[in-house]
Amino acid sequence: MSMKGKETMSKQNEKLVVGKLGSSYGIRGWLKVFSYTDNPESIFDYSPWYIDQKGEWVEYKVEGWKRHNKGWVVKLQGLDVREDAHLLTNFEIAIDPASLPELSEDEFYWRELFGMQVVTTNGYDLGVVTDMMETGSNDVLVVKANLKDAFGQKERLIPFLEEQVIKVVDRQAQRIEVDWDPAF
């Protein structure tokens, strides 16, 4: 099993947030880009982009992009002057989740795991996946424990380690089976 993508899910109109626009660059409407994808350059593989403006997703087409110092800059269609680009500084970039590539059966996007029930191999209900963390060595499930958890836990951090900890991920049943001590 492997995890693909650090993308975070935005529930509004089923868009998937994959990055953020930074400050304007130059005088011709370019903007700096901060990518949340595993491979930062892959953010440019998706088009169109959607920018949340006053609660509405506004569609933008990527006209061009290039490497700049240690990051990236992008030119969005319709933004031709610095002042227009500046208005989008710090706005999140989203895409249509349907544009994501299909994964193999043993690969998952983080967003697929959110809301899944987590149970031990002995059947103890640990709670529900509410978030994911990247630690560098492996991804970590953030599991909100049930209100009346027998071990007094409110939240559990469970490493997403195939075979060692994660035994089964059942997309159909929305359930993850883990080899994990409920006291942790």
From Swiss-Prot:
Boundaries of every PRC barrel domain copy: 105-184
SUPFAM superfamilies (UniProt xref): PRC-barrel domain, Translation proteins
A molecular-function term among this protein's GO annotations: ribosome binding
Lineage: Bacteria, Pseudomonadati, Pseudomonadota, Gammaproteobacteria, Vibrionales
Keywords of the record: Chaperone, Cytoplasm, Ribosome biogenesis, rRNA processing
Signal peptide span: none
Encoding gene, per UniProt annotation: rimM
Pfam families per record: PRC, RimM
Subcellular location: Cytoplasm
Designated name of the protein: Ribosome maturation factor RimM
Purpose of the protein: An accessory protein needed during the final step in the assembly of 30S ribosomal subunit, possibly for assembly of the head region. Essential for efficient processing of 16S rRNA. May be needed both before and after RbfA during the maturation of 16S rRNA. It has affinity for free ribosomal 30S subunits but not for 70S ribosomes.
